[in-house]
A protein has these predicted regions:
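C-terminal peripheral helix-coil segments that are non-catalytic and often amphipathic
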Residues: 114-115, 119-123, 127, 156-208
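Short secondary-structure transition hinges
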Residues: 77-133, 152
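Generic hydrophobic, amphipathic alpha-helix propensity
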Residues: 1-4, 21, 46-54, 117
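Hydrophobic alpha-helical connector segments
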Residues: 45, 56-89, 136, 140
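Helix-turn-helix
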Residues: 3, 7-41, 45
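Secondary-structure edge/capping motif, primarily at the C-terminal ends of alpha-helices
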Residues: 61, 90, 150, 154-157
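Phosphate/oxyanion-binding loops and surfaces in catalytic or ligand/nucleic-acid-binding neighborhoods
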Residues: 78-82, 86, 146, 150-153, ...
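All-alpha amphipathic helical-bundle segments outside canonical DNA-binding/catalytic cores
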Residues: 70, 105-112, 126-142, 157-165
Length: 208
């Protein structure tokens, strides 16, 4: 699975050859095809493993029991750290885009993420960090869309720059929905999270 994730993280789906995966793990083609009869079957398995990785990591953030908006901020940095440093996480997101439209997998997955973030945003409204009258689902959809956009326009192989894009996004977005009285603290919190995440990511990587 690790070899497959590396291939899917570094190449477009259409350019990944199962022979490359077989060569990387030194197994026979027969053994590979016994477990994964097609490239799509292997890709689907990678998506499933990436989902498990993400679920475990998110559970760790939720266990910190921070405020709702702090949790949303932490989750964005968590995803960025995984995306820039873990081939499995990166491959899972790439594959959701490339094959996830088949049978609506991408739409369902993103819908589940938006629903989960909306629940956290709703808590942030109750706690006073998000201003009254802001729709939690709208905020959740905005955050997901923003991350996807940064992912498309940024460079995942330049983690420090990518994290700065996340920080700038929060700086621009928060005035639109955060309680003005909390902006100073929240801005400081975002900067601290950038610094913490910067210590977790690998140096810039060149092309494979």
């Amino acid at each position: 699975m690790r070899a497959a994730a590396e291939q899917f993280a570094r190449k477009p789906y259409s350019l990944v050859n199962l022979d490359d995966v077989v060569a990387a793990v030194d197994i026979s083609r027969g053994a590979m095809y016994f477990h994964f009869p097609s490239k799509q079957a292997l890709a689907t398995a990678v998506i499933d493993e990436a989902h498990k990785l993400g679920h475990e990591a998110v559970a760790g953030v939720l266990a910190n029991k921070l405020s709702g908006l702090e949790t949303l901020i932490d989750l964005s940095y968590l995803v960025a750290v995984l995306d820039t440093g873990e081939d499995l996480a990166r491959a899972g997101l790439y594959l959701l885009e490339s094959i996830g439209r088949v049978e609506g997998l991408e739409a369902r997955s993103l819908g589940e993420v938006i629903d989960a973030l909306a629940q956290i945003a709703r808590r942030a409204v109750d706690e006073g960090d998000i201003a009254e009258g802001r729709d939690p689902e709208d905020i959740a959809r905005l955050l997901v869309s923003t991350y996807i956009g940064i992912r498309h326009t940024g460079d995942l192989d330049n983690p420090q720059q990518f994290l700065m894009h996340i920080e700038k996004a929060w700086t621009l977005l928060m005035p639109g929905f955060a309680n003005p009285e909390r902006m100073r603290y929240l801005s400081q919190f975002v900067r601290r999270r950038t610094a913490m995440a910067s210590g977790k990511v690998l140096p810039q990587r060149g092309p494979a």
